[in-house]
């Protein structure tokens, strides 16, 4: 048996690297310095956030110097929350080049231009809320009158699309649907559209891909429209968008993939980058776990195994609520 003292006080090798250290608030220090100078040294997920700031700064530098295509993917709950305004900021200032989202990411952006969502509570009785016509997304409330008014707008919008389809003898893709929606917002909504992602994507000609465009309220409205309208032949083509999205990755000199959440937007982006032998940079923000084999929880190294992220890519995954860390990430990079 070994000497217990030798076991406890086992000699260690000399270890070089970044020393763990937090910010000293006795010094004159601001949030920018905390994020850029200290977060990487704190450890745990703070280190990942600090690394993400550095990676995105590299991306931004390369975007200014050479052809760099930045893909941003986000699930609808990001738009349900106040992250919508952050994404709109990035689009407005052309910090991203391609957007991929779910149907909720489109429709909730539009609905917020009609009336705002309201801060609620996680624990209220669902049956009582249903009786009052109040929908709950986490601790965010969306009264149903928003959707009622949304249908009025969408019926008019579908009429425009249907006439366009018939006159041009062309079926619009989902990304063209989103572009036309941005144009419709420009022509029909007030100042609230200035906070909109879809509106600024239209103004800056930044494509929005939404492969599951019917999986949400837009799909509900399409159902009623096609059932009730005499001219119910309105169609949306999702096949052309896969060509357009993949070609944007293939034709790029370098690419970066920034993903909030998981599911369809995440896979659409990284799978497009498979066609160019993987993305050069990747930043994931997620709370999904990898242990169930889901795409949402798949870490960057899993993407490397598929060829969706390059072996030598600069990447990081932050395992955290995006509503907490994404504002700090954007601030650390752009402010």
Swiss-Prot record:
Catalyzes the NAD-dependent oxidative cleavage of spermidine and the subsequent transfer of the butylamine moiety of spermidine to the epsilon-amino group of a specific lysine residue of the eIF-5A precursor protein to form the intermediate deoxyhypusine residue. The keyword NAD applies. PANTHER family: DEOXYHYPUSINE SYNTHASE. GO terms for molecular function: deoxyhypusine synthase activity. It catalyses: [eIF5A protein]-L-lysine + spermidine = [eIF5A protein]-deoxyhypusine + propane-1,3-diamine. The active site is at residue 308. This is Probable deoxyhypusine synthase. Its cofactor is NAD(+). Pathway: Protein modification; eIF5A hypusination. It is an enzyme of class 2 (transferase). NCBIfam families: dhys, PRK03971.1. Belongs to the deoxyhypusine synthase family. Its EC number is 2.5.1.46. The gene is dys. The keyword NAD applies. Keywords: Hypusine biosynthesis, NAD, Transferase. InterPro entries: Deoxyhypus_synthase_arc, Deoxyhypusine_synthase, Deoxyhypusine_synthase_sf, DHS-like_NAD/FAD-binding_dom. GO terms for cellular component: cytoplasm.
């Amino acid at each position: 048996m070994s000497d217990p003292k030798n076991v406890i006080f086992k000699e260690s090798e000399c270890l070089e690297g970044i020393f763990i250290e937090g910010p000293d608030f006795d010094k004159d220090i601001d949030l920018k310095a905390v994020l850029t100078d200290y977060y990487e040294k704190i450890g745990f997920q703070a280190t990942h956030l600090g690394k993400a700031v550095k990676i995105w700064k590299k991306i931004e530098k390369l975007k200014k110097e050479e052809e760099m295509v930045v893909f941003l993917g986000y699930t609808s709950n990001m738009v349900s929350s106040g992250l919508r305004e952050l994404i709109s900021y990035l689009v407005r200032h052309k910090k991203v080049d391609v957007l991929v989202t779910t149907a909720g990411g489109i429709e909730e952006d539009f609905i917020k231009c009609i009336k705002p969502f309201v801060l609620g509570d996680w624990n209220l009785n669902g049956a009582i809320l249903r009786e009052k016509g109040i929908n709950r997304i986490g601790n965010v409330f969306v009264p149903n009158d928003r959707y009622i008014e949304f249908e009025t707008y969408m019926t008019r919008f579908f009429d425009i699309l249907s006439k366009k389809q018939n006159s041009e003898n062309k079926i619009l893709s989902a990304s063209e649907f989103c572009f036309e929606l941005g144009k419709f917002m420009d022509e029909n909504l007030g100042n609230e559209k200035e906070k909109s992602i879809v509106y600024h994507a239209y103004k800056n000609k930044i494509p929005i891909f939404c492969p599951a465009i019917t999986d949400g309220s837009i799909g509900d409205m399409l159902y009623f429209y096609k059932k009730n309208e005499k001219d119910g032949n309105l169609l949306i083509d999702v096949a052309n968008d896969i060509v357009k999205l993949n070609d944007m990755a293939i034709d790029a000199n370098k690419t970066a993939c920034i993903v909030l959440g998981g599911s369809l937007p995440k896979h659409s982006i990284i799978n497009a980058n498979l066609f160019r032998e993987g993305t050069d940079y990747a930043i994931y923000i997620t709370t999904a776990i990898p242990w169930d084999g889901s795409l949402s929880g798949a870490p960057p190294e899993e993407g490397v195994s598929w060829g969706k992220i390059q072996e030598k890519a600069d990447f990081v995954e932050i395992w955290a609520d995006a509503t907490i860390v994404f504002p700090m990430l954007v601030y650390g990079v752009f402010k």
